[in-house]
């Protein structure tokens, strides 16, 4: 099975989005570093859905780039279901321009970042953030992309 992706495109305009193969590649280069098999959903949404979900689940009154919803496996059950990633197209596109990053690289970074959240990583505390950013950089560079945090380090 390896990494099984359910890609949902819930946007008005699908033109210019990464391909399903892109999303699969990014997952295949991330999740097997931590576990051999997984199932997850990536849902690409517009700003309205992102805003509603971010408000409902995080209390933030704005859209966000990526939301992660890890699946909590009931005790005593064996399942490979990791959870869901909700990625907002407009926020990703806007951030790529603001951060002067290639759009495809920023999409890849959002998938890597969200996947690490599903795997239990976080960036609330400084030491956690440092570990997570280091992993993201290593994974992104392993796929041939630049350090996604290079602008912050300069």
Curated annotation (Swiss-Prot):
Domain of life of the organism encoding this protein: Bacteria
Record protein name field: Endoribonuclease YbeY
Record text on cofactor binding: Binds 1 zinc ion.
Gene Ontology cellular-component terms listed: cytoplasm
Disulfide bonds: none
Organism the protein comes from: Vibrio campbellii (strain ATCC BAA-1116)
GO molecular function, one term: RNA endonuclease activity
Name of a matching Pfam family: YbeY
Cell division in keyword set: no
Family membership: Belongs to the endoribonuclease YbeY family.
HAMAP family the UniProt entry points to: Endoribonucl_YbeY
Protein location: Cytoplasm
InterPro entries listed in its UniProt record: MetalPrtase_cat_dom_sf_prd, YbeY, YbeY_CS
UniProt keyword terms in alphabetical order: Cytoplasm, Endonuclease, Hydrolase, Metal-binding, Nuclease, Ribosome biogenesis, rRNA processing, Zinc
Binding site for Zn(2+): 113, 117, 123
């Amino acid at each position: 099975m390896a990494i099984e992706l359910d890609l949902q495109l819930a946007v008005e305009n699908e033109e210019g989005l990464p391909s399903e193969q892109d999303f699969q590649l990014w997952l295949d280069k991330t999740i097997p570093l931590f576990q051999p098999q997984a199932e997850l959903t990536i849902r690409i949404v517009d700003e309205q859905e992102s805003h509603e979900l971010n408000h409902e689940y995080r209390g933030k009154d704005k859209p966000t780039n990526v939301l992660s919803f890890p699946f909590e496996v009931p005790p005593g059950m064996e399942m490979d279901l990791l959870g869901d990633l909700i990625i907002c197209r407009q926020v990703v596109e806007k951030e790529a321009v603001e951060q002067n990053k290639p759009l495809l690289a920023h999409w890849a970074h959002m998938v890597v970042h969200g996947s690490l959240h599903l795997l239990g990583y976080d960036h609330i505390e400084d030491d956690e953030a440092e570990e997570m950013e280091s992993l993201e950089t290593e994974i992104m560079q392993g796929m041939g992309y630049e350090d996604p945090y290079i602008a912050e380090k300069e």
